[in-house]
Amino acid sequence: MTEKARKRIVVAMSGGVDSSVTAALLKEEGHEVIGISMQVWDYSKFSAPEGEKFDTCCSLDDIHDARRVAEQIGIPFYVVNFEEEFQRLVIDDFVDEYFRGRTPNPCVRCNQRVKFELLLRKARELGADLLATGHYARIERGGDGLFHLLRGDDPGKDQSYFLFTLTQEQLARVTFPLGGMTKPEVRQLATRFGLRVAEKGESQEICFVPDNDYVRFLEDERGAGQLVGEIVDRAGTVLGHHEGTYRYTVGQRRGLGIAHPHPLYVVGVDAERRQVIVGPKEELLAPGLVATDVTWVIALATETLEAACKIRYRHHPVPCTVTVLAGNRAQVRFREPEKSVTPGQAVVFYHGDEVLGGGWIDAAMTEG
C-alpha cells in the first residue's frame, strides 16, 4: 500500500466478531487503525445468571474482549464514555416512546445520534480519515460524486435498515468493510486471524435491556402503576383492564388476560386515553401509513415515487407508493395491505439494493 492510499481509520469495536474482523482486515491492508469502544450503559445494574453472559454488545465484558483483540492485532485502543449522552439521546427517547403508546427502535437512534454523530466526531478529533464499523451494508460512490447506501451482500445479516438516517457528509467519512461478505466468511477470517472472539455468539438483546424485560426496565425508569386503563375493541366496548399501556405493542396476542371466543390481537395503543385496543387478526391489516421525520440519503427530484419498503427489521420489502408531504412527512401506500404497522418503528425505502431513505411510522392508514 502506498503512503497516499494508507489511511488513519477509527474502528468502532464492540468486542464481537464483526468489529474485530473489521479492525484486523484494515490493519492487514496496511492502514493505521485505532480501536474505540463506547461505554454507554452501567451494567452493574444487572446481573446475569451464574455462569452465563447477557447476549448484548457494549457490556464491560465486551469492552474487555475488544481490548484484548486490539492488543492481539497490535493497534491502540481507547474507551469513550458516552453514558450521559446515551441516556439523553437514546434511553430517554426509548422510554418516552413507550409511554406515548409507541414501540421504538433504539438501534436506529443509537446509530443516528451516537455512533455516527458523537463517535464520528471523536474519530475526526483523532485525525482519522474514516470511521469503520462491522455493519453488513455497503457504500458506493456514483459517477455523480454522491454516496449510495446499499444492502449488505448477506441477505440474512443485512443491516442497511438501521442506517437510513446517514447523510452524504457521514457516508463520505464511513466505511463498512464487511458489506460484501457473509457471516460464515467473516467467522472464517476471524479464525484465520486467530481472534479469540472467532466463535463468540451474536448479540441478541438491546444493550441496555440485557435481560429483555422491557416492562421492568420501563418501570425502573418511570415507576410502576402508570397508564393503567381499559382494554377495548374498535367500537369502544370494554373487554377488560390492563396494568399499563406501555406493556403492549401492535400485533401482540399474549398477555391480554381477557376471555373471548376468538383470538384477539392488539391493533392499537392510545396512551392519552389509557386504552389498549384489540380486535381480530384482520384488523391488523392496513393499506398504508404516515411517516414523520423522513430523511433521504440522496435528495429526491420528485414528490411521488414507487419503491419497496420495510416496516420492521425482519420485514420482507414490499412494493409501495411514497408521496412526500410538507414538514418532512410522507404517506406510504402499500400495493397490498400489510400486517402490524407499528407506530414508533422505522419505515425504510429501497430501490433494488439501494436505500433511498426512511422515517418513523406515526400512524397506520385506516381507509382503503
Curated annotation (Swiss-Prot):
InterPro entries linked: MnmA-like (IPR004506), MnmA-like_C (IPR046885), MnmA-like_central (IPR046884), MnmA-like_central_sf (IPR023382), Rossmann-like_a/b/a_fold (IPR014729)
Localization of this protein: Cytoplasm
SUPFAM superfamilies: Adenine nucleotide alpha hydrolases-like
Site (Interaction with tRNA): H135, Q345
Major site of localization recorded for this protein: cytoplasm
Binding site for ATP: A12, M13, S14, G15, G16, V17, D18, S19, M38, G134
Annotated catalysed reactions: S-sulfanyl-L-cysteinyl-[protein] + uridine(34) in tRNA + AH2 + ATP = 2-thiouridine(34) in tRNA + L-cysteinyl-[protein] + A + AMP + diphosphate + H(+)
Organism superkingdom: Bacteria
Signal peptide range in chain numbering: none
Pfam family, one: tRNA_Me_trans_C
tRNA processing is among the record's keywords: yes
Disulfide topology: C110-C207
GO terms for MF: ATP binding; tRNA binding; tRNA-uridine 2-sulfurtransferase activity
GO BP: tRNA wobble position uridine thiolation
Catalytic center residues: C110 (nucleophile), C207 (cysteine persulfide intermediate)
A Gene Ontology term for the protein's cellular component: cytoplasm
PANTHER family the UniProt entry points to: MITOCHONDRIAL TRNA-SPECIFIC 2-THIOURIDYLASE 1 (PTHR11933:SF5), TRNA 5-METHYLAMINOMETHYL-2-THIOURIDYLATE -METHYLTRANSFERASE (PTHR11933)
Name of this chain's protein: tRNA-specific 2-thiouridylase MnmA
Organism the protein comes from: Geobacter metallireducens (strain ATCC 53774 / DSM 7210 / GS-15)
Species lineage: Bacteria, Pseudomonadati, Thermodesulfobacteriota, Desulfuromonadia, Geobacterales
